[in-house]
């Protein structure tokens, strides 16, 4: 097993032909592709794959791309419950390419973020995807924040983040004339990108290599096929049945789940542990009015408070030229609930800001109610558990780290499933 991998990650591959049964959103495969691991026919109501990835967000799609490029003979499908890909956490975040400064040295977050940021910049250049390496200031505004800022700087150096500088008030003013601060960390390798555009590019790569993406497929059940229990030929070739809420079925040999906000529930559907549980937090953003955008030149962050799993309310540039302020973090009463029950405008909103969008992010909790800080990957038990890998906790910086995560997933899938 990959040495640093505590539990395990998801995978992907390439589809074995067009979808029978007129499934919505099905994307087929050109003829003449290599033979998959197993032969077998498709009926009008089922399709079969070597590997199925549940979840069409950036981690699932990056993993699908990585596996199909590594194993072009595998039949692999991606299942997504929405009509479009990458519409939840992937499409509702700040769009920041993180440098890797925040995370505990030697943690998966630290390693994968530093690697992933470099890989992401390279990928965007290759694909012509717009991004800006605009940098970031992490600013201490009170004297008591300076020791934490200095410790964060040392952590960044330990993690191998390049170009970090501690700067004083005069240099802060040179970079951000309207920013008040005593000391700051200058992070020149931080950037911004539209992560949904990146995810859709991963999906295009996957499909171009022969993979199939099936949207409007909300998973209701994952179980061993009855034929596999009787050891019939079909049951042995494709022993796992994935059913959706419409009663349609997919058969496969192996499953990788990258279900984001529903990672615990999908795990439980397959008979695996529901822990760690996912608690959803809604984050609301405000938008600087266009005439006030001159106040902010780049990303500006506060010194993070280690008591909380979030980085604090910050100013973030966007690819469209707008500037976001946020997010806050409040308990969401629905896993995909992007609107609060009510909203009261304040005087300051009339002056410099407009109401902005919201996002919902998944935060894992262990059985004792403690926040789970690092990436968590899991495998099940028993016959079905041996054929399933779960991404259980992939919070920020998972988008930045997505290409690096996908490489780890591809390694682990290859080893576990003996591909």
From Swiss-Prot:
Transit peptide (first-last residue): 1-51
A single Gene Ontology CC term: mitochondrion
Primary enzyme class: oxidoreductase
Subcellular location, principal: mitochondrion
Annotated PANTHER family: L-2-HYDROXYGLUTARATE DEHYDROGENASE, MITOCHONDRIAL (PTHR43104:SF2)
Stored NCBIfam families: PRK11728.1
The protein's name: L-2-hydroxyglutarate dehydrogenase, mitochondrial
């Amino acid at each position: 097993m990959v040495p640093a991998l505590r539990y395990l990650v998801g995978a992907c591959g390439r589809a074995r032909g067009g979808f029978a049964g007129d499934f919505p959103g099905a994307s087929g495969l050109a003829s003449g592709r290599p033979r998959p691991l197993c032969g077998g026919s498709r009926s009008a109501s089922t399709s079969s794959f070597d590997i199925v990835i549940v979840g069409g967000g950036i981690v699932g799609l990056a993993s699908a791309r990585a596996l199909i490029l590594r194993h072009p003979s595998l039949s692999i499908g991606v299942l997504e419950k929405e009509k479009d890909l990458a519409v939840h956490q992937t499409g509702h975040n700040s769009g920041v390419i993180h440098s890797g400064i925040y995370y505990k040295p030697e943690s998966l977050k630290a390693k994968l973020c530093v690697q992933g940021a470099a890989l992401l910049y390279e990928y965007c250049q290759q694909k012509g995807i717009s991004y800006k390496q605009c940098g970031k200031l992490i600013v201490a505004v009170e004297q008591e924040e300076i020791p934490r800022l200095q410790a964060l700087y040392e952590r960044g150096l330990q993690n191998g983040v390049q170009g970090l500088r501690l700067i004083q008030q005069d240099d802060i003013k040179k970079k951000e004339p309207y920013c008040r601060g005593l000391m700051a960390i200058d992070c020149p390798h931080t950037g911004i990108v539209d992560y949904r555009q990146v995810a859709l590019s991963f999906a295009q790569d996957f499909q171009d290599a022969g993979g199939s993406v099936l949207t409007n497929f909300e998973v209701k059940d994952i179980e061993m096929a009855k034929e596999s229990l009787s050891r019939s030929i079909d049951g042995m070739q494709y022993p796992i049945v994935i059913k959706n809420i419409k009663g349609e079925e997919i058969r496969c040999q192996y499953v990788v789940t990258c279900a984001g906000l529903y990672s615990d529930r999908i795990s439980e559907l397959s008979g695996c542990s529901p822990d760690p549980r996912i608690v959803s937090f809604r984050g609301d953003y405000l938008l600087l009015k266009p005439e006030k955008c001159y106040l902010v030149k780049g990303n500006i962050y506060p010194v993070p408070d280690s008591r909380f799993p979030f980085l604090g309310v910050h100013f973030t540039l966007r690819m469209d030229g707008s500037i976001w302020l946020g997010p806050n973090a409040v308990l969401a009463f629905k896993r995909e609930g992007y609107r609060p029950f009510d909203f009261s405008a304040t005087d300051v909103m009339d002056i410099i800001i407009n109401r902005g969008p919201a996002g919902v992010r998944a935060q894992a909790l262990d059985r004792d109610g403690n926040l789970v800080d690092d990436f968590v990957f899991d495998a099940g038990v028993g016959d079905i558990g041996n054929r399933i890998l779960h991404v259980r906790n992939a919070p920020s910086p998972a988008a930045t780290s997505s290409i690096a995560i996908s490489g780890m997933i591809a390694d682990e899938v290859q080893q576990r499933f003996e591909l």
